[in-house]
Swiss-Prot record:
EC supergroup of this enzyme: transferase
Name of the protein in question: Acetyl-coenzyme A carboxylase carboxyl transferase subunit alpha
Matching NCBIfam families: accA, AccA_sub, PRK05724.1
GO cellular component, one term: acetyl-CoA carboxylase complex
Main location: cytoplasm
Tagged with keyword Zinc: no
């Protein structure tokens, strides 16, 4: 089975040109031409160009990487890390929301509850999952899952990847703000350890609703903010084209957020981003999740809850 065609971001043009040249030379080599040495030299140049490019990414470029269509999504992490996964559907009040996936399974032999936003990877799946923007029933499903996990003493893992909660009229009529607030409260009130990983976009209350965890991890090129750069640009300058300027001002990168104490750990991505080696990224994430839960193991419910609340109170005091 052939690999999917690689998708390049605008700022990756120099790397795209080198990769294209490599493909041309490999085709010639396959026809009998002895140009292996030349191919090796250009491959070395391409690796160097990629390393230099990704060592100096701007916040706006990181935003583009976080949204890359080939970046591993929630379903990929579940498939790579969770065995015996059994999804649960519906909020028992209105209906099912496929933007938010949740269920129970095993992580390295131990029971776990997994909740995550799924953006989809094709036109069909993006529409099915509403581009990862959950409606009220999605957040109420998350509350239902967290309540079950708490009752049975099962740790909770959140995989965060959303531009934000869905802002449609129907969602607002069904109590979007209340659903987000209750989900956030459920996260904070858990007596079992919970770990959140921002794997792509962490947008606004839609992300926070499942990310108020004992440990918050974030991929190197993910973003986490109260509003998207495009929306901030429209509000601040009445000009949606100034998204790049907004991103550069908003402190949305993992590096900024670690410095502010909003997150606990940055997970390094493969050179060129998680989309260049999804399997390696998923393995790295799995190791970090295991270490985070190991650190929280053995704590009683009161301590787990108190530490989590203190963590977020400290963020408020520090940045408020």
């Amino acid at each position: 089975m052939s690999e999917p065609m690689r998708s390049y971001l605008d700022f990756e043009k120099p790397v795209a040109e080198l990769d294209s040249k490599i493909d041309e030379l490999r085709a010639l080599a396959a026809s009998g031409s002895d140009i292996h040495e030349e191919v090796a030299k250009i491959e070395e140049k391409a690796v160097q160009a990629l390393n230099e490019l990704y060592a100096t990414l701007t916040p706006w470029q990181k935003t583009q990487v976080a949204r890359h269509p080939q970046r591993p999504h929630c379903v990929d992490y579940i498939e790579g890390l969770i065995t015996e996964f059994t999804p649960l559907a519906g909020d028992r009040k209105f209906g099912e929301d496929e933007a938010l996936i949740g269920g129970f399974g095993r992580f390295r032999g131990e029971s776990i509850c997994v909740i995550g936003q799924e953006k989809g990877s094709s036109t069909e799946t993006r529409l099915k999952h509403n581009f990862g923007m959950a409606r009220p029933e999605g957040y109420r499903k998350a509350v239902r899952l967290m309540d079950m996990a708490d009752r049975f003493g099962i740790p909770v893992l959140s995989l965060v990847d959303t531009a934000g909660a869905y802002p449609g009229i129907g969602a607002e009529e069904r109590g979007q703000a209340e659903a987000i607030a209750r989900s956030t409260d459920a996260c904070l009130s858990l007596g079992v350890p919970n770990v959140a990983v921002v794997i792509g976009e962490g947008g606004s209350g839609g992300a926070i609703a499942i990310a108020t965890a004992n440990k918050v991890l974030m991929l190197e090129h993910a973003i986490y903010s109260v509003i998207s750069p495009e929306a901030a640009s429209s509000i601040l300058w009445r000009d949606g084209t100034k998204a790049q300027e907004a991103a550069n001002s908003m402190k949305i990168t993992a590096q900024d957020l670690l410095r502010f104490g909003v997150i606990d750990q940055i997970l390094p991505e493969p050179k060129g981003g998680a989309h260049r080696d999804p399997a390696a990224m998923i393995a790295t994430t799995g190791d970090a999740i295991a270490a985070a839960f190991a650190e929280l193991a053995g704590l009683d419910a009161g301590t787990v809850r108190a530490r989590r609340r203190q963590k977020f109170l400290e963020i408020g005091r520090k940045l408020g």
